[in-house]
Amino acid sequence: MTGKPDISSFEDLEVFQRAYRVPLDLHRASLQLTKIEQRGLADQIRRASKSICGNIAEGFGKQRRSSAEFKRFLLMASGSADEMQVWLKYCSDLDYIDRNACEHWRDEYRQIARMLQGLYTSGARALLITDY
């Protein structure tokens, strides 16, 4: 045993699993926004929330060549998690989505950002795949 975590896919990462679950409910809630916001705020919420998982997956795939590439994509995912906090604040302040739900999701994205930062600073090198 090498001491490395048993992670063979981006889907094995806890941060990916969490970042995948949150947008499912958020997507449904965004569909309830006004028609005028469907092409603006709602669309941005759907894209930014899903880009977190996309960046984790893309970075994980590129880590075979470079841990620096993986880390770069983790930074982009973290940026999207921070961006989501802004969009959710707008939804709350404009009374588009229940304030308690928005605060819950903002907490989730804060936690996801912390997890991504932790992976960036300590775990990205440990996950580097060398056995293929």
Task: List where the protein language model places each region.
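Amphipathic alpha-helical assembly/interaction segments
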Residues: M1-Y132
